[in-house]
Amino acid sequence: MIKSIFITFCTVLLCCNTLAAEVQTPQDSVRFSEYLPVRHTDPVTWVTRYQGEIDRYQTENRTLRDTSCNVLFLGSSSINLWDNIYRDMAPLKILRRSYGGAALRDMLYNYDVIAREYHPRSIVVYVENDLAGTPEDLTVGETFDFFRLLTNRLQRDYPDIPIFILSYKPSLARKEMIPKHEIINTLLKEYASKTDGLTYVDVASCLYGANGELRKDIFKPDGLHMNQNG
């Protein structure tokens, strides 16, 4: 369901040949002195925990002859576990630079590997592990700041292409986090509406049934990731 909605949405926008010419680079929207304070974060852990996957992407990048693509996907396991992504997105050419457990913090640290030196026509960002109900979580405000840091950097490197921010999705495994997810989604939606070149895509609303309850038939057994119905 999420996949079909997004595929249709993305394809329509990619067909708009004038879109890229109309995108303007916004001024930096994040203002801070020296650093963003983040609690419960071990720098070594966040730097090295997924180094194996980053090394694999570095190896791929060295042998990648054509770095152009219609869509560059950045994010966490919900992108990584989209098993049929190449088939579902066909005939669009995609490049996936996602890894399970990715958070905004390590995505920024690994930015040069996962997000630079490519030639995409659009970029999709989906990451939700900064608000996952763990001791390492950021606050909603910190998460929003890191989203802006990431999108600002993407827009500096790719000033003429559209960037799609997928909303946080509710899940059975993280139901207690839904109130925070709704707040961050509201912030991201407003931010995208005021920033040229950014588009917010709501993938949360369609996961509820007619009774207002979160659907159970669209999740894998872990209650977090989507199955083929989702």
Summary of predicted features, one role per range:
Residues 1-71, 87:
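N-terminal secretory targeting modules
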Residues 126-132, 152-183, 204-208:
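Active-site segments of SGNH/GDSL-like serine hydrolases
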Residues 170-230:
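Catalytic His-Asp segment of secreted/periplasmic serine-dependent ester chemistry enzymes
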Residues 64-67, 88-89, 116-117, 157, ...:
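Extracellular/periplasmic catalytic domains that process cell-envelope and extracellular macromolecules
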Residues 72-74, 95:
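Conserved beta-strand elements of the Class I
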Residues 79-95, 106-144, 164, 168-172:
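Oxyanion-hole/transition-state-stabilizing segment in secreted/luminal serine hydrolases
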